[in-house]
């Protein structure tokens, strides 16, 4: 355990020092094929992570070079994948700091390099200084990064369904973890969940409705949220579901 902010946002993770990551000649962004990894990772396994002892020890400036004195991360995309929705958050809320948390090393490397490339492209305007990605296990270390009542919004988009009953304990939504999420969420904060697996959706809804610190938004409230339309295909996984004409199951909950 060390006091750290995680991987620096401008660091190259997939090449030898001084060698640029392969980028597209058209977009100038890193090419995903160089960052392929298994679709899911075992969150219970003993991965080796550096993590801070407490939120005060996090070096946020290493991830957000333009962070203002006293400014805090407001939005957390848990299991951010390749960062599509995280980037959308940064564009929608330029005054808010958004963090993506991803357990898979190559995938998190890709997001870090993607953000670095976007920052270079937008250097004249200071674009994308408000988004960052951190490789960590959110199921274990979330309270090490965020203070009580710090977050305004948390996102769980297309999480690993862990179909086998014996692996249900690995699901990112369970009663114990919901209490941790409630701790770092401010009152009135929102938890957004989206999946293409109906069984997992029912599991999420059942567990969150059983928890005393959450209430589900009505359909009218959810539809009025400007973020809702972006949940369907801003992420790479969501876009794949749309292409395949799959189902989306949405549930948004308010912290009481």
Curated annotation (Swiss-Prot):
Enzyme class: transferase
GO MF annotation list: tRNA (guanine(46)-N7)-methyltransferase activity; tRNA binding
Superkingdom: Eukaryota
Gene3D superfamilies (UniProt xref): Vaccinia Virus protein VP39
Alphabetical list of Pfam families matching this protein: Methyltransf_4 (PF02390)
Record function comment: Catalyzes the formation of N(7)-methylguanine at position 46 (m7G46) in tRNA.
SUPFAM superfamilies for the chain: S-adenosyl-L-methionine-dependent methyltransferases
Catalytic residue positions: 160
Start-end of Polar residues biased regions: 1-15
Listed InterPro entries: SAM-dependent_MTases_sf, Trm8_euk, tRNA_(Gua-N-7)_MeTrfase_Trmb
GO CC terms in record: nucleus; tRNA (m7G46) methyltransferase complex
Known EC number: 2.1.1.33
Region named Disordered: 1-22
Keywords for this protein: Methyltransferase, Nucleus, RNA-binding, S-adenosyl-L-methionine, Transferase, tRNA processing, tRNA-binding
Record's subcellular location: Nucleus
rRNA processing found in the keyword field: no
Protein name (database record): tRNA (guanine-N(7)-)-methyltransferase
Reactions mediated catalytically: guanosine(46) in tRNA + S-adenosyl-L-methionine = N(7)-methylguanosine(46) in tRNA + S-adenosyl-L-homocysteine
């Amino acid at each position: 355990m060390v006091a750290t902010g995680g991987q620096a946002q401008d660091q190259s993770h997939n090449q030898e020092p001084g060698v640029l990551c392969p980028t597209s000649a058209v977009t100038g962004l890193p090419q995903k094929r160089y960052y392929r990894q298994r679709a899911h990772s075992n969150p219970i396994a003993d991965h080796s992570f550096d993590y801070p002892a407490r939120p005060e020890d996090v070096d946020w400036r290493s991830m957000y070079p333009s962070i203002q004195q006293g400014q805090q991360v407001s939005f957390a995309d848990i299991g951010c994948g390749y960062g599509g929705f995280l980037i959308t958050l940064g564009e929608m809320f330029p005054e808010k700091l958004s963090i993506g948390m991803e357990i898979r090393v190559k995938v998190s490397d890709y997001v870090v390099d993607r953000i670095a490339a976007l920052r270079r492209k937008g250097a004249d305007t200071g674009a994308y200084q408000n988004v960052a990605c951190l490789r960590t296990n959110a199921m274990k270390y979330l309270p090490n990064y965020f203070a009580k009542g710090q977050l305004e919004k948390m996102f769980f988009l297309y999480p690993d369904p862990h179909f086998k009953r014996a692996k249900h304990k690995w699901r990112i939504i369970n009663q114990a973890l919901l209490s941790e999420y409630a701790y770092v969420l401010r009152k009135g904060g929102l938890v957004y969940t989206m999946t293409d697996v109906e069984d997992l959706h029912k599991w999420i809804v059942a567990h969150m409705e059983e928890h005393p610190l959450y209430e589900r938004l009505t359909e009218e409230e959810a539809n009025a949220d400007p973020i809702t339309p972006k949940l369907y295909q801003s992420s790479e996984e969501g876009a794949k579901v749309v292409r395949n004409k799959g189902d989306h199951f949405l549930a948004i909950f308010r912290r009481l």
